[in-house]
A protein has these predicted regions:
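Acidic/glycine-rich phosphate/pyrophosphate-binding loops and surrounding catalytic core
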Residues: 2-216, 220, 232-237, 250, ...
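Extended hydrophobic secondary-structure segments
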Residues: 222, 226-228
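Short secondary-structure boundary segments
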Residues: 225, 253, 274-275
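Conserved hydrophobic residues forming the short capping helix/wall of the S-adenosyl-L-methionine
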Residues: 238-242
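Active-site loop ensemble at the mouth of alpha/beta enzyme cores that anchors a bound cofactor
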Residues: 286-291
């Protein structure tokens, strides 16, 4: 099993370096034709403005992008990672070679806009369940190649990461259950790999399946597309199972920001939201240059 990504500062910095290198290769390839009109040694100052209120996220990616083009660039953040910034606020000042800043501009802003969008949306969802036991959890519905960056943004916005990929945890879904011959049979079948997994979770669609999962020793159960009365009954059944049989309960399916609080008030532990990383509204940032 590949190790579960730990999101430590060094690991995030290395991830940002790799993502930035790949993005710059995609955008610049063998040279920025337009930036070549600027004299190689000319210096410039740039500032990045938020055009709307947001939770800022993506500083490691911005810095990696800029410094791969100008290792000596000076970067000063005026809004910290995970902090709320206001519309028209200057969030960042950069000083470096004009060519490097011009070439880095779009790639750096792409990272900042995307990751701030994820963090901002996650914060809105996390705020909506504040005061309940529920935590907001992400999914694997991410942009190809940017999963770890998006999951970092979810954490920055106050959410919790579910499994990183298929390699680090077990999620038994309806097709697995059908193939195995039932919930209990599916749980028995994954026992040989359970020790290698960060967790084992089983998806259920009915209260009968929930009871079967609890009796089989499931420690995490995903309640899929249940209506409110059924969810409340599921929480009651789980509570009555006793401390040694009780599972962590997670909701998935049809989750909206408007209905989130009602779901959280049922007493579930986790609410998974694919929209955090799948339906992202990028935050509007712009970069303005001043000749240095």
């Amino acid at each position: 099993m590949s190790p579960r990504f730990d999101f430590s500062a060094p690991a995030v910095a290395a991830l940002a370096q790799a993502d930035a290198a790949r993005a710059l290769q995609e955008d610049v390839a063998d040279g920025d034709l337009t930036a070549s009109l600027v004299a190689p040694g000319r210096r410039a100052h740039a500032r990045v403005l938020a055009r709307e209120a947001a939770v800022l996220c993506g500083a490691p990616w911005v810095e990696a992008t800029v410094r791969q083009l100008d290792p000596q660039a000076r970067i000063r953040w005026l809004c910290g990672e995970g902090e709320r910034c206001a519309a028209d606020q200057t969030v960042l000042e950069i000083e470096g070679t004009a060519r490097a800043l011009l070439t880095a501009e779009r790639t750096a802003l792409n990272f900042l806009q995307l990751l701030s969008g994820v963090a901002t949306k996650t914060t809105a969802y996390a705020d909506a369940v504040r005061g309940t036991r529920a935590r907001i959890v992400d999914t694997r519905k991410t942009l190809p190649g940017l999963r770890l960056a998006q999951k970092y943004a979810v954490r920055t916005g106050g959410g919790v990461n579910h499994r990183i990929g298929l390699y680090d945890a077990v999620l038994i879904k309806e097709n697995h259950i059908a193939a195995a011959g039932g919930v209990a049979a599916a749980l028995r079948a994954v026992a040989p790999v359970a020790q290698r997994a960060a967790f084992v979770e089983v998806e259920v669609e009915t209260l009968a399946q929930l009871r079967e999962a609890l009796e089989a020793g499931a420690r995490m159960v995903l309640l899929d597309n249940m209506d409110l009365p059924t969810l409340r009954e599921a929480v009651r059944i789980n509570a009555q199972a006793g401390e040694d049989r009780k599972a962590v309960l997670e909701i998935s399916g049809g989750v909206t920001l408007e209905g989130l609080r009602t779901l959280a008030d049922t007493g579930v532990d986790r609410i998974s939201v694919g929209a955090l990383t799948k339906d992202v509204k990028a935050i509007d940032f712009s970069m303005r240059f001043q000749e240095g």
